[in-house]
């Protein structure tokens, strides 16, 4: 089959060469963006007098017909035409005749594909931001219902200090807020148009790049044609931001997995977000959380794959850049799916408040309160730390907790202890008295919730 670029060649590629070099199996994901970019390019060519009004109308009608067919899933792509651009061009020529070949005036597939990917990420990053905000809203809703739900806070996966469950949930809210800000900031780089950069050096046709950029909703154009067609830093930035987001989701997933285990029993996942075992009838597995944790690795791989592709490429376009798309598509699908799943998982999970509360009474997470108690009475904190450490050791030796220790033994350790010490040992007291900004005190958590809600309402903090 004759290639659209085949004039210089005396032989056609072998079938397996065509198959190896073709990208239509995956870049057909760009069909809507490719047609959208072509519509803007045709309108610009008419404005600049390169196409007549009649020619532009026929091209526009043909492209809109193809776009409608694409939305209906009625387009049939062929490996014979390599990629999405040549497939659409061939379909347009079949639809309106040789005039379809005039559309490519003043552009190359190099700037065309870069434009497609800018449009693709522009749409999907906007959607990801919306999904992050939906997840944040779910966290706020769950946190509002659990301000006074207390559980052990952990360091080194060892019980450390009692905290509000709402405080724990809001920690992820703020991680997600920074993730959202990174995606929002990346739009400055995504929202630029490479259309009209040509193969690498621009074009001799009197085109208006600013006009086509305006039609496509871009804020600006690439100032250098070499840069516009050859760099993929905007994709790398997206992959990096996605990796950061997935890292946060993976950390949260790990906690979900722990919390719903029989060893913790802090939460129970809804049946709609769990699976069973083909052999063990009692099992209820947190597969969705495990998958999100696992899929984080593939997103990291997508990012490192493109970094590795880019590191040795001279200017300008190289065929290596065909490999920039599959990782991008994969990451978009993974991130969007993970956010949707996690939002539903949080909304529907059951919080076992009594189990969480009981866990704060069966440990020594209130030991810091004792040390602070002595320090507030004038004992140097290091000395107070030593005193309380010995009390903890005594309790461990006797198989009791600090709240079980007789008052007389507290006074033997230090005469600064008074009978109010048992109030101090109450986990609710420990949480309530954390009054510093950003702390787990109930009032501070209420204030944090109000700020979080304002951030979601405004779309930015």
Curated annotation (Swiss-Prot):
Record-level GO cellular component terms: cytosol
Protein name: Argininosuccinate lyase
GO molecular function: argininosuccinate lyase activity
Keywords (A to Z) from UniProt: Amino-acid biosynthesis, Arginine biosynthesis, Cytoplasm, Lyase
Highest taxon in the source lineage: Bacteria
Principal cellular location given in the protein's record: cytoplasm
Location relative to the cell: Cytoplasm
Keyword Iron: no
Upper classification of the organism: Bacteria, Bacillati, Bacillota, Bacilli, Bacillales
Segments crossing the lipid bilayer: none
């Amino acid at each position: 089959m004759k290639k659209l670029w085949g004039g210089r060649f005396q032989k056609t590629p072998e079938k397996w060469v065509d198959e190896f070099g073709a990208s239509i199996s995956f870049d057909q994901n760009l069909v809507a963006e490719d047609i959208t970019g072509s519509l803007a390019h045709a309108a610009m060519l008419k404005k600049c007098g390169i196409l007549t009004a009649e020619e532009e109308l026929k091209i526009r009608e043909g492209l809109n017909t193809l776009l409608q067919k694409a939305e209906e899933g009625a387009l049939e792509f062929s490996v014979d035409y390599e990629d999405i651009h040549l497939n659409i061009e061939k379909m347009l020529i079949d639809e309106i005749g040789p005039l379809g070949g005039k559309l490519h005036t003043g552009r190359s597939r190099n700037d065309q594909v870069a434009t497609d990917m800018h449009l693709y990420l522009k749409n999907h990053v906007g959607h990801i931001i919306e999904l992050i905000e939906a997840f944040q809203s779910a966290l706020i809703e769950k946190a509002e219902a659990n301000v006074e739900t207390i559980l052990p806070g952990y360091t080194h996966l060892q019980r450390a200090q009692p905290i509000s469950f709402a405080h724990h949930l809001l920690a992820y809210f703020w991680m997600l807020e920074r993730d959202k800000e990174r995606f929002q900031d990346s739009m400055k780089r995504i929202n630029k148009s490479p259309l009209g950069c040509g193969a690498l050096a621009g074009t001799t046709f009197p085109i208006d790049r600013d006009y086509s950029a305006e039609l496509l909703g871009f804020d600006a154009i690439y100032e250098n044609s070499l840069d516009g067609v050859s760099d993929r830093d905007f994709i790398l930035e997206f992959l990096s931001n996605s990796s950061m987001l997935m890292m946060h989701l993976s950390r949260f997933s790990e906690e979900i997995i722990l919390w719903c285990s029989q060893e913790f029993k802090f939460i129970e996942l809804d049946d709609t977000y769990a699976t069973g075992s083909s052999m063990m009838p009692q099992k209820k597995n947190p597969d969705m959380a495990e998958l999100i944790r696992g899929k984080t690795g593939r997103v990291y791989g997508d990012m490192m794959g493109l970094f590795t592709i880019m590191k040795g490429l001279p200017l300008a376009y190289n065929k290596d850049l065909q490999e920039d798309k599959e990782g991008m598509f994969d990451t978009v699908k993974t991130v969007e799916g993970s956010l949707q799943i996690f939002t539903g998982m949080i909304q529907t999970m059951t919080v076992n408040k009594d189990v969480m509360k009981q866990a704060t009474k069966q440990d020594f997470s209130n030991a810091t309160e004792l040390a602070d108690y002595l320090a507030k009475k004038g004992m140097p904190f290091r000395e107070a730390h030593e005193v309380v450490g010995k009390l903890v050791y005594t309790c461990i030796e006797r198989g009791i907790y600090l709240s079980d220790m007789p008052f007389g033994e507290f006074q033997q350790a230090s005469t600064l202890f008074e009978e109010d010490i048992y109030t101090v040992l109450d986990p609710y007291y420990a949480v309530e008295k954390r009054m510093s900004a950003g702390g787990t005190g109930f009032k501070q958590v209420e204030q944090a919730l109000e700020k979080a809600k304002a951030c979601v309402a405004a779309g930015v903090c």
